[in-house]
């Protein structure tokens, strides 16, 4: 099952999440919106197993990256009973 990985604008380009991911789901891409001139991107979300190591590694208090597991995605969309 793939999971939704969202990168938010609080990314500081530190690469901690990329290094923490055991499946190389994340990568850094050029971006002019931060001092590091790069931001995390998730081009391979279908490979995400939902371990949330990227969230744990993120120094911006879990605000840069969110991994939504299948049940969480359903709840957040108001589809759960």
Curated annotation (Swiss-Prot):
[4Fe-4S] cluster 2 binds at residues 21, 48, 51, 54. Its cofactor is [4Fe-4S] cluster. Binds 2 [4Fe-4S] clusters. Cluster 2 is most probably the spectroscopically characterized electron acceptor FA and cluster 1 is most probably FB. GO terms for cellular component: photosystem I; plasma membrane-derived thylakoid membrane. One of its GO terms (molecular function) is oxidoreductase activity. The keyword Oxidoreductase applies. Keywords: 4Fe-4S, Electron transport, Iron, Iron-sulfur, Membrane, Metal-binding, Oxidoreductase, Photosynthesis, Photosystem I, Repeat, Thylakoid, Transport. It is a peripheral membrane protein. Changing residue 14 to D/S: Considerably decreases amount of functional PSI, grows mixotrophically only under very low light. Residues 2-31, 39-68 form the 4Fe-4S ferredoxin-type domain. It comes from the Bacteria. [4Fe-4S] cluster 1 binds at residues 11, 14, 17, 58. It catalyses: reduced [plastocyanin] + hnu + oxidized [2Fe-2S]-[ferredoxin] = oxidized [plastocyanin] + reduced [2Fe-2S]-[ferredoxin]. Its EC number is 1.97.1.12. The keyword Repressor does not apply. Apoprotein for the two 4Fe-4S centers FA and FB of photosystem I (PSI); essential for photochemical activity. FB is the terminal electron acceptor of PSI, donating electrons to ferredoxin. The C-terminus interacts with PsaA/B/D and helps assemble the protein into the PSI complex. Required for binding of PsaD and PsaE to PSI. PSI is a plastocyanin/cytochrome c6-ferredoxin oxidoreductase, converting photonic excitation into a charge separation, which transfers an electron from the donor P700 chlorophyll pair to the spectroscopically characterized acceptors A0, A1, FX, FA and FB in turn. HAMAP family: PSI_PsaC. The cyanobacterial PSI reaction center is composed of one copy each of PsaA,B,C,D,E,F,I,J,K,L,M and X, and forms trimeric complexes. PANTHER family: PHOTOSYSTEM I IRON-SULFUR CENTER, PHOTOSYSTEM I IRON-SULFUR CENTER-RELATED. This is Photosystem I iron-sulfur center.
């Amino acid at each position: 099952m793939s999971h939704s990985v969202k990168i938010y604008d609080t990314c500081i380009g530190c690469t901690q999440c990329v290094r923490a991911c055991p499946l190389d789901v994340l990568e850094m891409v050029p971006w002019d919106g931060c001092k590091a001139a790069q931001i995390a991107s998730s081009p391979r979300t279908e490979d995400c197993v939902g371990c949330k190591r990227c969230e744990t590694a993120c120094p911006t208090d879990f605000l840069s990256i969110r991994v939504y597991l299948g049940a969480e995605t359903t709840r957040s969309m108001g589809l759960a009973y």
